[in-house]
A protein has these predicted regions:
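Structural scaffold positions in well-ordered secondary structure
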Residues: 22, 40, 49, 68, ...
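A structured beta-alpha segment of the ubiquitous adenosine-cofactor-binding alpha/beta core
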Residues: 1-42
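Acidic, glycine-rich segments within the central catalytic cores of soluble metabolic enzymes
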Residues: 74-166
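Rossmann-fold NAD(P)-binding glycine/threonine-rich loop
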Residues: 27-81
Length: 166
């Protein structure tokens, strides 16, 4: 229980010998207990510290909570998922699994591995700020490319593919 002094001290002791610390709270979740990146970095300069939140650590929505289905909608994925408008069951739908959570975890692994590789060179850890929304939007690169090339916004096409299946 990191809200208690004993729990905070335990986290500090663990951080001294840790390679990576991952937090997945609203902004300031660990910081308010003296367990933020700067505090942990003083204990272990080689620590890679990853913060996952809905909207990132700064910006107008940073303090807001978020969850997978909400991020799928805000990130544009729901606008592409499901049957086309005007067809039975048409309209935006969420993906059947927590795909925004999963893809954020995949980006987290890539970021951590890159930071660990850099640490081998520099001897220093890094801070990684990763948001569910940013990683969700990044997965829409093909739709963005299609829009930039054609000027047509992407639409829901059911199981069809906008570039392969006519």
């Amino acid at each position: 229980d990191f809200s208690q002094p004993e729990g905070q001290e335990l986290i500090r002791r663990l951080a001294i010998g840790a390679d990576v610390l991952i937090e997945n709270f609203k902004v300031g979740g660990l910081e308010r207990y003296g367990l933020g990146y700067e505090a942990m970095r003083t204990l272990n300069p080689r620590l890679v510290y990853l913060s996952i939140s809905a909207f990132g650590q700064d910006g107008p929505d940073a303090a807001k909570p978020g969850y997978d289905a909400m991020i799928q909608g805000m990130g544009g994925l729901m606008s592409l998922t499901g049957a086309p408008d005007g067809t039975p069951g048409g309209g935006p739908q969420k993906v059947g699994i927590a795909v925004a959570d999963l893809m954020c975890g995949m980006y987290a692994v890539a970021g951590i591995l890159a930071a660990l590789q850099e640490r081998e060179r520099s001897g220093l850890g890094q801070y990684i700020d990763l948001s569910l929304l940013d990683t969700q939007v990044a997965w829409l690169a093909n739709q963005a490319m299609n829009y930039l090339v054609t000027g047509q916004p992407p639409t829901r096409q059911g199981t069809a593919h906008p570039n392969i299946v006519p």
